[in-house]
Design a protein with these regions (language model features):
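Electropositive phosphate-/nucleotide-binding environments in soluble metabolic enzymes
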Residues: 20-23, 27, 68-72, 93-97, ...
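Alpha-helical scaffold segments in soluble metabolic enzymes
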Residues: 28, 32, 77, 102, ...
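Active-site gating loops and adjacent loop-to-helix segments of metal-dependent hydrolytic enzymes
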Residues: 4-15, 56-82, 124-136, 140, ...
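Glycine-centered positions in the ABC transporter ATPase nucleotide-binding domain
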Residues: 295-296
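Divalent metal-dependent hydrolysis catalytic cores, especially in the metallo-beta-lactamase
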Residues: 1-29, 43-55, 82-93, 108-109, ...
């Protein structure tokens, strides 16, 4: 399973991600995750629905023909998961007024991504309960002198979380350092954005009929467009320590406690505490992964 593949790299809990697709496919994905949690499949915390309520101008490798309007029917579908957490990435400027608030009221965690929103639109979305930003600097309106955009809103927010793809390619090292400095280890969330090549002997896969190739820690289309990563969270920690210069303690927090806080599970995962899951790793003196425990069992 996806969870088992990531666990051997030290990621003991995750949200499997479905990118933009038909509502029928989304319904099936939610049912599959619900069944996995009911069966107590180790490591599955819920689901991340990245789309299809995105902005075509920031589509990345998403199929824009799948993009839809966030109506009441869609809201009811997106919040159908009975067990675990639902993280939804959407473009706030495409959401009708009150839609984000309704998603949050129904228990979803909402992040902004693949968005051309203005600073003001993000502030309005935060007032409805927007909690963070999926891939800071990627597929979003950038910071400029008179238009702070999504990036400006994310970096100036005192409370929101920002997911960071720390492969050294998606985001320039200077910008990675800026995120780490402004948001700190408590709100900088290392994300893998990992594709099926991670942990596989194969260096390519097909996405919607197009071949995607893994080169180092990053995945690309044949035209050189970024298409996710070949990155584990342990890899991301290494990049942050080597290239950005943060310490091991902060890197560990960005890969564990911060993600757990971002989705409201800080009491269950992401830290060693009474009552929390016994998920932890052993690193050597050079921060190499030595052993992994999941629910108290060594893998």
């Amino acid at each position: 399973t996806i969870a088992r593949a990531h666990a051997k790299f030290g990621t003991t809990a995750l949200l499997p991600t479905l990118i933009s697709d038909d509502l029928e496919k989304i319904a099936l994905a939610i049912e599959a995750v619900d069944a996995a949690i009911e069966a107590e499949v180790p490591g599955v915390l819920g689901i991340h629905l990245e789309g299809p309520f995105l902005n075509t101008s920031r589509k990345g490798v998403h199929d824009a023909s799948k993009f839809k309007v966030l109506d009441q029917e869609a809201i009811e579908l997106l919040t159908r998961l009975k067990r675990g957490k639902t993280l939804i990435t959407l473009a706030p400027e495409t959401a009708p007024p009150g839609a984000i608030a309704e998603l949050v009221r129904r228990g979803a965690v909402v992040f902004a991504g693949h968005t051309e929103a203005s600073y003001e639109q993000i502030i309005a979305a935060e007032a409805e309960g927007l909690r963070g930003f999926t891939h800071i600097f990627n597929a979003m309106s950038q910071l400029s002198s008179r238009a702070p955009g999504v990036v400006g809103a994310a970096l100036s927010s005192p409370t929101s979380f920002s997911g960071l793809i720390a492969d050294g390619v998606h985001v320039h090292v200077a910008n990675m350092a800026l995120v780490a400095r402004l948001l700190g280890p408590k709100r900088t969330v290392l994300v893998s954005d990992a594709m099926p090549t991670l942990g596989s002997d194969q260096d390519w896969f097909e996405l919607k009929g197009e071949k995607i190739f893994a080169r180092g820690l990053t995945c690309y289309t044949p035209d050189g467009v970024l298409a996710g990563s070949n990155l584990s969270l342990h890899d991301a920690m290494g990049v942050m320590m080597r290239q950005v210069g943060i310490g091991l303690t902060d890197a560990l927090q960005m890969a564990s406690h911060a993600p757990a806080r971002a989705i409201g599970l800080e009491g269950q995962v992401g830290r060693l505490a009474v009552g929390a899951r016994a998920d932890f790793v052993q690193l050597d003196g050079d921060s190499n992964l030595v052993r992994v425990w999941q629910r108290g069992v060594q893998l």
